[in-house]
Amino acid sequence: YCQELRYPYYAHGMSQVLSSRGGDFTGITNGIDTKLFDPMTTEGLAAHYNEKTFKEGKLQNKLALQKTLGLPEDRDTAMLAMVTRLAGHKGIDLLCYIAERLMSRRVQLVVIGTGEEKYEWFLRGLQERFGRQVSVNLCFSADLANVVYAGADLYLMPSKSEPCGLS
């Protein structure tokens, strides 16, 4: 991302300043902060796991999350998750665009977040239409987010621009 910021298109008017920094301008990549979320020690998980036990641990957390959210408990259904602000630059409009096709597949979608009213309304409607596949949680809860990180099969982050910030 730091290389992209050297181009005017991505830099929001700051490309010259950022380019002038030369080699001391670096990027920090996204990822889960293991000080805040560690599947071996985070409280509130159905099962703790590490790189050797993750298959069984993820499955136990997934089944527990499905039960908690009122979704059918199905180990073979792909669970997609988003923990995000519901804002255009976070790519929520991309989810809106593919939602119909996505729901025609064997998937469950879990969304946690708040934001622009139009996206909240869209997600509420999606949950009404596909309630056995969709759980929309218009809030932010670090505890629920941790359970989602522990149990989801895939994490969606369709940001149009993500300056190595928060998910």
Enumerate the language-model features and the residues they cover.
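Catalytic cores of nucleotide-sugar-dependent glycosyltransferases that transfer UDP/GDP/TDP-activated
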Residues: Y1-S167
